[in-house]
């Protein structure tokens, strides 16, 4: 249970309040810089927890359970704080909302499908969706650290919209599978 991969996953969950704390004050470029470094570190641990678990035969039920939760907590927290600080504002909130709602819906669908003993493997497109989400949010955090480079914010918002589109497509894939198994 207390394997290195599981500890790395837990460290991501524990780091979320720190990440949010550094993003709390809009306009504090140093805070955004620290948050960006922490966000990158969290992304690296996300990669290594899975890699270490698979390569060392340390895959556990706890890790399988916690890893997607850690990812969703991090994404949801960053989206919410960036909306709260208006780093994601106006029409761009729609893209953020699409991402949040899809994550909630797919979590519910996965729970339902597990109860009817249907496994839905993560598709390659869903992996690209996650990557684009993480790049978008990282870009938006980085934009706060680089206030003299407004194009970084624009790139982050464009990536957020790209992630929202992939979110809808992959969400529809999960919904189609779920609908086949509903009464």
PLM-predicted stretches and their roles:
Residues 1-183:
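Alpha-helical transmembrane bundles and membrane-interface segments of multipass inner-membrane proteins
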